[in-house]
Amino acid sequence: CVSHEFKKNVLEKYEDNSFFDMKIDTKFNHKGNLRYGEYFIKGKKDKEILISTYLCHPSMANNELSGPIVTMSLIDYFKKKKINYGLRFVIIPETIGAISYIHKNLKKLTRNVFCGFNITCVGDSRNYTFIKSKYENSPSDYSIEDVLKNKKLKYTKLNFLKRGSDERQYNSVGVNLGITTFSRSKFDEFPEYHTSLDNFDFVSIKSLTQSFNVIKDSIELIQSRIYPKTQIVCEPFLTKRNFYPEINIKGRKFKDKTKLILDFLQYSDGNFDLKKISKKIKCKYSETKDIYKYLLKIKLVS
């Protein structure tokens, strides 16, 4: 990053095809440190939603300050609530911060986090943007789009090939946390990006509040849903578990009921909520809930 005056001076003195040698006058200090902020709100269940944002470039209002402002507002809101899934908030330097945080907490993250959001560039007044997780099947992918649709807001939906922020690290091979990036104007695609025009005139309290409400509602939607996860490998032997009397599915033969339960288990990977499983296996929601309750009772799902 250079000042506008420095850039102007270079453009006046040199040709477009000029080459420069860059000297980085620094040393690696093994005793150095990297600081980040972390705040955890415990839920009823062990599973967690990760909320990450970054703070590293100085003086940029939308790119650097809007994410932490909305994130701190989320902390203030949810710490007063009773929640089902834990909320883990992280404020880090972009890229190197995410890599460092993952390095230090990988086992905990992969064990507990089942979805989440990377929040950036949420202070301007343009349309919303979200980048889906790598496999496009994360609860955060579904919830953010459901909220934007229900609010009838204009938005752009992008796949993971359009990544560019910390979702690169959180969704990388060996990590795969199912993180969705949420923005207004997408980073690196708005004229003010990484310029002095990304200032307090470019963002507004109104836009920050609107963004806060969208992401808050998305988190609350995830909190309100049940995401079954199969606790065994391969199909279970159901006969010995005496499921027939406990599943109330009228008008279906024993064979059909067995197939429904096995179908339910196939989609119980922690990413599909009960309503989506119900739609997928073509079963009434009330019947799907009965299947879930039974499988939970005999510890085939969590």
Language-model features: locations:
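N-terminal hydrophobic/helix-forming segments and targeting peptides
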Residues: 1-302
